[in-house]
Amino acid sequence: MATPHINAVEGAFAETVLFPGDPLRAKYIAETFLENVEQVTDVRNMLGFTGTYKGKRISVMGSGMGIPSCSIYATELIKDYGVKNLIRVGTCGAISTDVKVRDVIIGMGACTDSQVNRLRFKGQDFAAIANYELMNAVIESAKVKGTKIRVGNVFSADLFYTPDPQMFDVMEKMGVLGVEMEAAGLYGVAHEFGARALCVVTVSDHIRTGEKTTSDERQTTFNDMIVMTLDAAITL
């Protein structure tokens, strides 16, 4: 039952999918944390895998960069493959001075400069928020592991290289914790088609201070975030 962008067979995906932007990161997650792994799709090298984690079936697939790419894969996973839970896992740039590099941010809501949710909501503003059950599961997992997390709004940007850096001042004033490029679109798709979605990201750099993590620090923090998220996923 291939779609235009996924060539997996029916039933290839678990109900819960971890959803990093980078397909090679999806491969890394599958090979590092899952058992009995099978690659289930590879159209346009957007790799997807299904395996087990602590005995529960879990999938992981790349979403690509930005809301348009993420929305395509999220829509097909939900509508054509019956996926119920999509958890974006990735990195972001911090905005708030209270947020530090290596912190983990849970995107309770996603602001955006994209028009996609207005297009699907008849021109009105749509509250792009995470699913409470998914969010609570990850928060509880973080408590068990002692992982430092921040819960609040992220900003899903259409442009990586923004022509208006003064917008960062507005974001900080409004309490935005970090900037990424997918969550608002993912939340919109999930609400439209009756699925559940969440964005969990590590802070790889601080937009305001210029501080950046090293590659080793980034990998360690990412691994901790993935374990925390997988432990939450098996409770769903």
From Swiss-Prot:
Phosphate binds at G21, R25, R44, R88, V89, G90, T91. Its EC number is 2.4.2.1. One of its GO terms (biological process) is purine nucleoside catabolic process. It catalyses: a purine D-ribonucleoside + phosphate = a purine nucleobase + alpha-D-ribose 1-phosphate; a purine 2'-deoxy-D-ribonucleoside + phosphate = a purine nucleobase + 2-deoxy-alpha-D-ribose 1-phosphate. It holds the Pfam family PNP_UDP_1. Keywords: Glycosyltransferase, Transferase. One of its GO terms (cellular component) is cytosol. It is an enzyme of class 2 (transferase). The record marks R218 as: Important for catalytic activity. A purine D-ribonucleoside binds at H5, E180, M181, E182, S204, D205. The active site is at D205. The keyword Transferase applies. GO terms for molecular function: purine-nucleoside phosphorylase activity. Homohexamer; trimer of homodimers. PANTHER family: PURINE NUCLEOSIDE PHOSPHORYLASE DEOD-TYPE, URIDINE PHOSPHORYLASE. Belongs to the PNP/UDP phosphorylase family. Catalyzes the reversible phosphorolytic breakdown of the N-glycosidic bond in the beta-(deoxy)ribonucleoside molecules, with the formation of the corresponding free purine bases and pentose-1-phosphate. This is Purine nucleoside phosphorylase DeoD-type.
